[in-house]
């Protein structure tokens, strides 16, 4: 069974979000199950030179894009037993950021065409083409509409994964007409047309044999207007080929027993070492070293989606408790400024790191007691899974993957691995935070809760089995 992942980003090459983590970890887990996965992505100039040096030029071809042929170098390399192909074209990929350019429609039209034009030259017979998010959605659409009559492509099945429905790849009609050479028959509401523009993600949904969302709850949510980003009707129409498979975490990266970034390695049987990480975190940020004061942390993009309006509304009320708070992330200036002001107002209780620091993030996960993630929506979420693996108890809103992975603690049965609230309401969140703090001070209960969190399986194994079953079903 041969699978080709078409992605716009992938760890360890380049990362802007969770898509890169999925693309980096899932193929390795599938390989353990006997599934051969190769990955194709752009050769961005942002990729570390050391990784590019590990690739060799496999072939040079031309990619037809509108009225012209564009250069396409196919670089080939291997990392952790997985084969990668990098699509080389400096005109499109020598940029200072992955996305957000005026010609993104052209860049990813080129990449979509390049993926398909490369397939006969890969020395790899593709059984299933698995595309991800808007950037590669048109790979599946073009395969069905323009390539599948060719014997080299006719057997290929397609899977399309929605990581975040909010970003759809909406561009002027000229992208469709001039670059992809698709005619008027594709510019209507049953095809690519979307409020007078062209929607790449819509193409992926329409044309793919199977669609997955990154959690079962998110799969249901996106079929409703509130979460559906104007594609809810289309997703209801194609509900029969839509499924939800929750993401995992790469346990070779996120594992407190082996993590080289943290001060003291530990497991569920050596939680005193977790306290050593807490003290190290307090020292790093210059917080008073109080063992019995819970540290509440957030490692997040500072955006509206992450529920920061709730946090902002009741933050001072949380500060009335005996707590310390650490925020690590960057994003919208209004939230950055708010947290910086709170750090100024509460210097003994609040510390903020604007930006991202991988090593520090690991230490925050290891050294905190509670992890706050009150998202407005969350397709899957990685932070709560990492927090659970490190015995840092998540406080989440019941949406998307947060609902699928965090079970609220039940004091009657002792079951659960975190705390959650349903409504997007600041005082519901506050009540849940206060409830978590209360249980934190009940040491036998808290220790049991931490052990329950740490002993669950958050690896990619279950997800990989579900994807293998999906691929197998397509090939039967």
From Swiss-Prot:
Record GO terms (molecular function): alpha-1,4-glucan glucosyltransferase (ADP-glucose donor) activity; alpha-1,4-glucan glucosyltransferase (UDP-glucose donor) activity
Known EC number: 2.4.1.21
Which EC main class describes this enzyme?
transferase
For this UniProt record, give its keywords in alphabetical order, as a comma-separated list.
Glycogen biosynthesis, Glycosyltransferase, Transferase
Reply yes or no: does the keyword Nucleotide-binding apply.
Answer: no
InterPro entries reported for this sequence:
Glyco_trans_1, GS/SS, Starch_synth_cat_dom
What is catalyzed by this enzyme?
A: [(1->4)-alpha-D-glucosyl](n) + ADP-alpha-D-glucose = [(1->4)-alpha-D-glucosyl](n+1) + ADP + H(+)
- Annotated residues for binding of ADP-alpha-D-glucose: 15
Q: In which pathway does it act?
A: Glycan biosynthesis; glycogen biosynthesis
What domain of life does the UniProt record list for this protein's source?
Bacteria
A GO BP entry: glycogen biosynthetic process
Indicate whether Glycosyltransferase appears among the record's keywords: yes
Pfam families in UniProt:
Glyco_transf_5, Glycos_transf_1
Tell me, in a sentence or two, what this protein's role is.
Synthesizes alpha-1,4-glucan chains using ADP-glucose.
What family does the entry list?
Belongs to the glycosyltransferase 1 family. Bacterial/plant glycogen synthase subfamily.
Q: What is this protein called?
A: Glycogen synthase
Q: Which organism is it from?
A: Bacillus cereus (strain ZK / E33L)
Gene label = glgA
């Amino acid at each position: 069974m041969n699978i080709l992942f078409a992605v716009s980003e992938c760890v360890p090459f380049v990362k802007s979000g969770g898509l890169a983590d999925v693309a980096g970890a899932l193929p390795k887990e599938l390989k353990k199950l006997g599934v051969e996965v190769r990955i194709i992505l752009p050769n961005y100039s942002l990729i570390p030179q050391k990784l590019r040096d590990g690739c060799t030029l496999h072939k040079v071809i031309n990619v037809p894009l509108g009225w012209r042929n564009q250069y396409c170098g196919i670089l080939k390399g291997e990392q952790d037993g997985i084969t990668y192909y990098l699509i080389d074209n400096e005109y499109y990929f020598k940029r200072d950021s992955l996305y957000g350019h005026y010609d993104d429609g052209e860049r990813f039209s080129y990449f979509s065409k390049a993926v398909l034009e490369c397939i006969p030259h890969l020395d790899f017979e593709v059984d299933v083409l698995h595309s991800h998010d808007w950037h590669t959605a048109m790979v599946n659409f073009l395969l069905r509409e323009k390539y599948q009559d060719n014997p080299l492509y006719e057997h290929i099945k397609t899977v399309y994964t929605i990581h975040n429905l909010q970003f759809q790849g909406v561009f002027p009609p000229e992208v469709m007409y001039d670059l992809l050479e698709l005619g008027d028959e594709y510019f209507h509401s049953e095809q690519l047309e979307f409020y007078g523009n062209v929607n790449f993600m819509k193409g992926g949904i329409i044309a793919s044999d199977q669609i997955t969302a990154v959690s079962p709850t998110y799969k249901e949510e996106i079929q409703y207007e509130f979460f559906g980003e104007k594609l809810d009707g289309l997703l209801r129409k194609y509900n029969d080929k839509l499924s939800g498979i929750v993401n995992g975490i790469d346990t070779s990266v996120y594992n407190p027993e082996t993590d080289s970034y943290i001060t003291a390695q530990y497991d569920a049987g050596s939680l005193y070492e977790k306290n050593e990480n807490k003290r190290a975190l307090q020292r790093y940020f210059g917080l008073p070293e109080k063992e019995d004061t819970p540290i509440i942390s957030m490692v997040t993009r500072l955006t509206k989606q992450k529920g920061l309006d709730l946090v902002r509304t009741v933050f001072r009320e949380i500060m009335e408790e005996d707590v310390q708070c650490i925020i690590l992330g960057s994003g919208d200036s209004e939230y950055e400024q708010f947290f910086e002001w709170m750090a100024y107002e509460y210097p003994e209780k609040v510390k903020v790191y604007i930006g991202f620091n991988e090593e520090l993030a690991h230490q925050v996960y290891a050294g905190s007691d509670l992890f706050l993630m009150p998202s407005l929506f969350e397709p899957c979420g990685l932070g709560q899974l990492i927090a659970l693996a490190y015995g840092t108890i998540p406080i989440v809103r019941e949406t998307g993957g947060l609902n699928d992975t965090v079970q609220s603690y039940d004091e009657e049965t002792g079951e659960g691995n975190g705390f959650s609230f349903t409504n997007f309401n600041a005082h519901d969140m506050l009540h849940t935070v206060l409830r978590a703090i209360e249980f934190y001070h009940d040491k036998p209960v808290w220790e049991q809760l931490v052990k329950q969190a740490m002993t669950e399986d958050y690896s990619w194994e279950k997800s990989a089995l579900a994807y293998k079953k999906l691929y197998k079903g397509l090939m039967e």
